[in-house]
Amino acid sequence: MASVAAKREGPQFISEVSVRGNGAVLDYCRTSVSALSGATAGILGLTGLYGFVFYFLASFLLSLLLILKAGRRWNKCFKSRRLLFTGGLVGGLFTYVLFWTFLYGMVHVY
């Protein structure tokens, strides 16, 4: 009975389809938060370094929320924890700047 109750030792198998699906969800979350935070920064009138600091704070907050959501068993969903922090960071920056400049121009220039 002890052998049945013991945990199975060996390599952990990961579904590539699930990993890609989780990556797509992360990209969607990162893009959505980038657009929302860019719009917020534009409406608030942030300029220069304050705007970029706002993006990195919003991105860091999203990463913390994703880590909390994944919990202790993050390795069942992702290959590495670094993906939760850096995945889509640069692509999100381009989305952020697009919404930031658009909303800043609409609210404060026109």
Swiss-Prot record:
Listed InterPro entries: Emc6, EMC6-like
Membrane topology: Multi-pass membrane protein
Topological domain spans for side Cytoplasmic: 1-28, 72-89
Subcellular location, record wording: Endoplasmic reticulum membrane
GO CC, alphabetical: EMC complex; endoplasmic reticulum membrane; membrane
Lumenal side: 45-50, 107-110
Pfam family for this entry, one: EMC6
Keyword terms of this UniProt record: Endoplasmic reticulum, Membrane, Transmembrane, Transmembrane helix
GO biological process entries: autophagosome assembly; protein insertion into ER membrane by stop-transfer membrane-anchor sequence; tail-anchored membrane protein insertion into ER membrane
Membrane-spanning residues: 29-44, 51-71, 90-106
Cited function: Part of the endoplasmic reticulum membrane protein complex (EMC) that enables the energy-independent insertion into endoplasmic reticulum membranes of newly synthesized membrane proteins. Preferentially accommodates proteins with transmembrane domains that are weakly hydrophobic or contain destabilizing features such as charged and aromatic residues. Involved in the cotranslational insertion of multi-pass membrane proteins in which stop-transfer membrane-anchor sequences become ER membrane spanning helices.
Subunit structure: Component of the ER membrane protein complex (EMC).
PANTHER family cross-referenced by the UniProt entry: ER MEMBRANE PROTEIN COMPLEX SUBUNIT 6 (PTHR20994:SF0)
Protein family membership: Belongs to the EMC6 family.
UniProt-recorded name of the protein: ER membrane protein complex subunit 6
Gene: emc6
